């Protein structure tokens, strides 16, 4: 795979999300990521497989709505984002944080 294609796949995955739900999902071999809003499930699975050398069995995506926020007297919106819950094959795992 060329370095340009690998870089494009790396741009799909923005960051892992560490939330209460995300830590519960780790026990089920599922990982929570923030991804670019235009990415589809196939692209997300390919990116995870290439970046972490694991086998993805399932991808669930979720687009929470953009929220309105008030800053002083001005009303604005928080940027929207897309989440992906990635299920890995039995026996595979991703090390999100190195052991200390």
From Swiss-Prot:
Lineage top rank: taxon: Bacteria
Any one GO MF annotation of this record: rRNA binding
Annotated Pfam families: Ribosomal_L23
Assigned keywords, A-Z: Ribonucleoprotein, Ribosomal protein, RNA-binding, rRNA-binding
Similarity-based family: Belongs to the universal ribosomal protein uL23 family.
NCBIfam families: PRK05738.2-4, PRK05738.3-4
Gene Ontology BP annotations: translation
HAMAP family: Ribosomal_uL23_B
GO cellular component: cytosolic large ribosomal subunit
Subunit and partners: Part of the 50S ribosomal subunit. Contacts protein L29, and trigger factor when it is bound to the ribosome.
Record's function text: One of the early assembly proteins it binds 23S rRNA. One of the proteins that surrounds the polypeptide exit tunnel on the outside of the ribosome. Forms the main docking site for trigger factor binding to the ribosome.
InterPro entries: Nucleotide-bd_a/b_plait_sf (IPR012677), Ribosomal_uL23-like (IPR013025), Ribosomal_uL23/eL15/eS24_sf (IPR012678), Ribosomal_uL23_CS (IPR001014)
Protein's UniProt name: Large ribosomal subunit protein uL23
């Amino acid at each position: 795979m060329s370095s340009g294609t690998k870089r494009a796949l790396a741009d799909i995955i923005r960051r892992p999300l560490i939330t209460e739900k995300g830590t519960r999902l780790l026990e089920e071999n599922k990982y929570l990521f923030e991804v670019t809003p235009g990415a589809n499930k196939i692209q997300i699975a390919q990116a995870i497989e290439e970046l972490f050398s694991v086998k993805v069995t399932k991808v669930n995506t979720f687009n929470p709505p953009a929220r309105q926020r008030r800053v002083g007297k001005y009303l604005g919106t928080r940027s929207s984002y897309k989440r992906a819950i990635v299920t890995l094959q039995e026996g595979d795992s991703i090390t999100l944080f190195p052991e200390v």
